[in-house]
């Protein structure tokens, strides 16, 4: 069993077309369960790598739900509390603390309840469209790892919108990260997320993403292949269902630039 996607409480599912190299999100409240039993014992056998990836997936769910254009008074508390729990519990859970593993199981469920109602953003759009895009090269960009790599870049992109910047600042305040201005708070938030990736052995960019998902000097996605497929991936990401609730609507040019930042780990 896994702990991170919160499919037990959401209206979302995913179909992967490996021939086309695309993941398709499906959203319908008819697939939301009437009752969910969240049993933390089921998460205790998760491998360490899975703990890392699903944990950052849950963090992305909560942050994207909080800054989504569909956020509301009922989803904000769920998202913020999930963020705080993940901040304190994910790294210890990754290092084998089973009490924190239990707590993470609850946190990911809270994040799921938040995003199932508030929806997501382009971190997920990009993860959906890059995940299987290079499967012909013998590997898959694991969804949670993709979210972890892209989240700091998307925050920097979205924070150019003043409303989104304010929401990210509120997250940083809730996490007690410090900072005197909104710009400082956004920078501290992205820096904190990058440190979490370091602690979880997750790469910062596609270029350094190894076939085993661990950081490496040269990842499994060749630069020339990435650049060749970039326009199509960007177009597909813009059309993804999660893009509509993102606080900034990217153009084709902006999405390509953002994906390049995620490949090379350059500033947005």
Regions found by a protein language model. Give the residues of each.
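Glycine-rich phosphate/pyrophosphate-binding beta-alpha loops
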Residues: 4, 109-147, 240-245
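Glycine-rich phosphate/diphosphate-binding loops and the adjacent beta-loop-alpha structural elements
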Residues: 64-121, 131-136
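Short, amphipathic C-terminal "tail helix"
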Residues: 220-268
């Amino acid at each position: 069993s896994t702990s991170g996607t919160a499919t037990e409480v959401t209206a979302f599912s995913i179909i992967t077309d490996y021939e086309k190299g695309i993941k398709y999100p499906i959203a319908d409240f008819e697939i939301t369960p009437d009752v969910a039993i969240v049993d933390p014992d089921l998460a205790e056998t998760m491998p360490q790598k899975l703990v890392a990836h699903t944990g950052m997936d849950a963090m992305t769910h909560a942050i994207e739900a909080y800054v989504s254009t569909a956020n509301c008074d009922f989803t904000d508390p769920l998202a913020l509390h999930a963020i705080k729990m993940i901040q304190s519990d994910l790294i210890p859970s990754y290092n084998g603390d089973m009490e924190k593993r239990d707590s993470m199981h609850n946190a990911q469920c809270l994040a799921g309840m938040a995003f199932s109602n508030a929806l997501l953003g382009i971190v997920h759009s990009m993860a959906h469209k890059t995940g299987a895009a290079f499967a012909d090269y013998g590997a898959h960009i694991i969804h949670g790892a993709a979210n972890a790599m892209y989240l700091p870049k998307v925050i920097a992109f979205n924070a150019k919108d003043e409303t989104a910047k304010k929401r990210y600042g509120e997250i940083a305040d809730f996490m007690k990260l410090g900072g005197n201005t909104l710009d400082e708070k956004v920078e501290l938030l992205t820096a904190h997320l990058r440190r979490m990736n370091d602690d979880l052995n997750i790469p910062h960019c596609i270029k350094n993403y190894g076939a085993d998902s661990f950081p490496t000097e040269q990842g499994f996605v060749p630069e020339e292949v990435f650049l060749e497929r970039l326009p199509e991936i960007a177009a597909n990401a813009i059309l993804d269902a999660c893009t509509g609730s993102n606080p900034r609507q990217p153009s084709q040019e902006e999405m390509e630039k953002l994906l390049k930042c995620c490949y090379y780990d350059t500033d947005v």
